[in-house]
């Protein structure tokens, strides 16, 4: 009852004169899509718009609802894409994401095409020179009486640039979507869509290279990053099922993938007093059968190391180890959001509520495998096994999480010069289910080689966790004159651990993750220039992270020999602080347009301490407070010109990222890099269009690696001219697209 009263009190606080931004003051809040679909690392997911604090993946709002409840565990891009079936797409404001999602970020926000005033069809076909084929087909038509329908089919058959013997298609995505809509005479609207999605993703964007030590890399032998495969042609894998403890086999291609059904419905109507009401709901039923092969270390194998070929011949040479996670998950969601918005004089108000539920049955099995560290490698056995030391990192959780929130936003237009907007979100979260935690008295739940739920003494642990989350936002715009203005934003959120974080050997901390972002600056706008310069401070407390840390064993332990670089997962909490200065400008001069962005920042860890314990008994407390955040550049620069003469459009996008630290000790780093794109579009008519695009036209490698052996190293000397493996940018890729409209 106290929680309900708390939520009600916050909602009542938001009822006083809620408002929308006045048009005359909107110059400080421009939206765009920031070329969010131009991702140099992946051709199937949006890029993350960085605020200086790392995050994996991005939230996505589709038709007023999250495409997925979580960004990490079941990322939103698995069910979403922007194409012919998309009506509009832009980015959320920071206060929008905080109030609607409880998170801070610039996230894609799209609406789907459902119905049309007249019958229309469109087909888009894209091919690249590596053999990727995409087809997007959309058909929409009125049905009479205000009813309409829409059909969309999307197929992506992607061979990847480093063709794998394991599979012909590294990624095969199939979306089938059908929808109906009804428009009422009073302007109201109803729509419903059903989508079936099937996704198989076996891409492996990894390769070996020489880390020189000065931030640069050199090729390893004849291996070509982005072009050569770094996986053996092993069609299946072995694992120990954590449910029954049996050793089983699974095929990567035939038995893998993600399948889901998604039903979405929405209703919008203007009420008698002029207020606008909207209600949206989405149900997703999904089953995942996925593998993730994380890079381990590259080792020197001798005659007695235990590595050998299938015929028993010992192997001597470089060995690449991989740590594989196999997910068998049912991940289902029911998400509903309702909003009510109205106006009163020069003010307007918005109120909303979320009821989001995820129920999942998650089994994560782990194992290891190894192969020759070279291109087109052969698989190696370790002590006679192709897949060895299973389930030392096994995870299990069966249960649900409900998130129930109310939010409101107020805006006051005090004068043509001054606007103030404030918002609140209050959220109650409940997580319940069963896990297998290695707590005091439950030591048998501790993971070891071959562990399962039927191992001796293993006991399930009931989980019941209640938390209060929330957000508060404040935006102030002051117009100095017709061109100049001032802007101040403040956004605060509180979050707690999510359902998927309860799968591990130990429960996550119950401490909240608090985010506070404050920024302020000036903006300028005239007929050809839109300019904004902002200084921001962003702090995130109690950040939850599961890190992979490496230590060279001093004696045989855990099923590994002495000298083996053992990698273990350790969960920890820490804080991060980022002080940034960002200048953003849009230039519009006739057929020429230019977007430029420069960010200078100082990203650092704080309150970062943890104590790993390895199989040989080694344990030490590490403190990395004050270190630069790994993988986060201090300087980012974006240059995006375009020129549109007649039926042509020529464009380019170049992003510069300064030095990025490899390890948390900041002893190793990678040199600056450019991510580049360019293209030309030609509209033959309003029915036929062609596009030629080039990804990474500078063909930079952009190699990056965690160098696990150096994860806790202070001395960079042992890692000069060091053989390692990591990721890279997509190699230079030429794409050609044709779009036909009927």
Language model features: what each stretch is:
Residues 20-118:
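Acidic, small-polar-rich N-terminal luminal/periplasmic segments of exported/outer-membrane proteins
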Residues 258-289, 314-443, 467, 471-493, ...:
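Face-selective signature of the C-terminal outer-membrane beta-barrel domain
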Residues 212-223, 298-314, 363-393, 439-456, ...:
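Surface-exposed loop/turn segments flanking beta-strands in extracellular/periplasmic regions
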Residues 416, 525-664, 686-687, 737-741:
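Gram-negative outer-membrane beta-barrel transporters
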Residues 126-134, 156-185, 201, 236-266, ...:
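Outer-membrane beta-barrel proteins
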Residues 120-122, 126-157, 164-228, 263-266:
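Transmembrane beta-barrel wall of Gram-negative outer-membrane proteins
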Residues 189-262, 292-323, 376-391, 399, ...:
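Acidic/polar loop-and-plug regions of large Gram-negative outer-membrane beta-barrel proteins
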């Amino acid at each position: 009852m106290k929680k309900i009263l708390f939520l009600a009190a916050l909602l009542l606080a938001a009822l006083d004169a809620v408002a929308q931004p006045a048009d005359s003051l909107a110059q400080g809040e421009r939206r765009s899509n920031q070329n969010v679909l131009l991702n140099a690392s992946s051709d199937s997911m949006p890029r993350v718009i960085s605020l200086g604090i790392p995050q994996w993946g991005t939230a996505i709002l589709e038709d007023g609802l999250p495409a997925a409840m979580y960004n990490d565990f079941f990322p939103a891009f698995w069910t979403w894409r922007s194409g012919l079936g998309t009506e509009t797409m832009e980015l959320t404001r920071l206060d929008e994401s905080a109030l609607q999602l409880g998170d801070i970020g610039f996230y894609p926000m799209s609406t789907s095409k459902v119905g049309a005033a007249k019958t229309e069809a469109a087909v888009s076909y894209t091919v690249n020179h590596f053999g990727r084929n995409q087809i997007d087909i959309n058909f929409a038509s009125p049905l009479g009486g205000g009813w309409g329908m829409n059909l969309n089919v999307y197929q992506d058959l992607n061979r990847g640039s480093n063709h794998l013997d394991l599979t012909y298609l590294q990624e095969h995505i199939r979306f089938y979507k059908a929808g109906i809509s009804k428009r009422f005479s009073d302007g109201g609207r109803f729509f419903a869509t059903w989508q079936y999605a099937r996704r198989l993703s076996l891409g492996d964007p990894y390769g070996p290279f020489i880390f020189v030590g000065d931030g640069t890399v050199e090729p390893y032998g004849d291996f070509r990053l982005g072009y050569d495969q770094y996986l053996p042609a092993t069609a299946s894998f072995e694992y120990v099922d954590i449910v029954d403890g049996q050793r089983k086999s699974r095929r990567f291609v035939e038995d893998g993938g993600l399948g889901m059904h998604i039903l979405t419905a929405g209703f919008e109507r203007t009420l008698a007093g002029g207020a606008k009401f909207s209600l949206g709901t989405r149900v997703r039923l999904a089953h995942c059968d996925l593998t993730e092969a994380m890079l381990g270390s590259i080792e020197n194998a001798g005659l007695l190391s235990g590595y050998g070929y299938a015929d028993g011949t010992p192997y001597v040479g470089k060995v690449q180890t991989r740590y594989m996670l196999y997910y068998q998950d049912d991940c289902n969601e029911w998400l509903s959001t309702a909003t009510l918005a109205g106006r009163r004089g020069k003010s307007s108000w918005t109120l909303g509520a979320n009821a989001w539920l995820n129920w999942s049955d998650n089994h994560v099995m782990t194992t290891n495998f190894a192969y020759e560290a070279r291109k087109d490698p052969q698989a190696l056995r370790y002590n006679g096994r192709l897949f060895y030391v299973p389930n030392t990192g096994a995870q299990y959780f069966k249960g649900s999480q409900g998130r129930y929130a109310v939010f409101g936003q107020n805006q006051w237009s005090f004068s043509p010069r001054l606007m103030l907007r404030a918002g609140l979100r209050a959220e109650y979260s409940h997580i319940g289910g069963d896990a297998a935690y290695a707590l005091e008295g439950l030591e048998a739940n501790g993971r070891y080689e071959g562990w399962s739920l039927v191992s001796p003494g293993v006991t399930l642990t009931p989980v019941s966790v209640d938390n209060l989350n929330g957000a508060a936002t404040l935006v102030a715009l002051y117009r100095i004159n017709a061109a100049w203005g001032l802007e101040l934003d403040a956004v605060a959120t509180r979050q707690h651990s999510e359902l998927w974080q309860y799968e591990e050997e130990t429960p996550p901390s119950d401490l909240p993750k608090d985010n506070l972002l404050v920024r302020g600056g000036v903006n300028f706008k005239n007929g050809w220039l839109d300019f904004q310069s902002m200084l921001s401070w962003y702090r995130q407390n109690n950040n939850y992270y599961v890190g992979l840390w490496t230590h060279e064993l001093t004696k045989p332990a855990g099923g590994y020999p002495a000298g083996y670089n053992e990698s273990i997962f350790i969960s920890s909490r820490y804080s991060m602080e980022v002080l940034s200065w960002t200048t953003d400008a849009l230039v519009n001069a006739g057929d020429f347009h230019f977007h430029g962005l420069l960010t200078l920042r100082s990203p650092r860890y704080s309150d970062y301490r943890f104590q790993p314990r390895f199989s040989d008994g080694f344990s030490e407390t590490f403190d990395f407070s004050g270190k630069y955040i790994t993988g986060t550049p201090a300087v980012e620069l974006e240059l995006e010109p375009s020129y549109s003469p007649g039926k042509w459009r020529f464009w380019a996008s170049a992003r510069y990222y300064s030095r990025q630290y490899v390890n948390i000790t900041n002893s190793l780093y990678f040199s600056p890099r450019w991510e580049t794109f360019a293209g030309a579009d030609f509209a033959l008519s309003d029915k036929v269009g062609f596009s030629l695009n080039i990804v990474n036209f500078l063909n930079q490698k952009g190699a990056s690696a965690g160098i696990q052996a150096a994860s806790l190293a202070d001395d960079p000397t042992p890692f000069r001219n060091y053989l390692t493996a990591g990721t890279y940018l997509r190699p230079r890729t030429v794409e050609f697209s044709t779009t036909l409209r009927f």
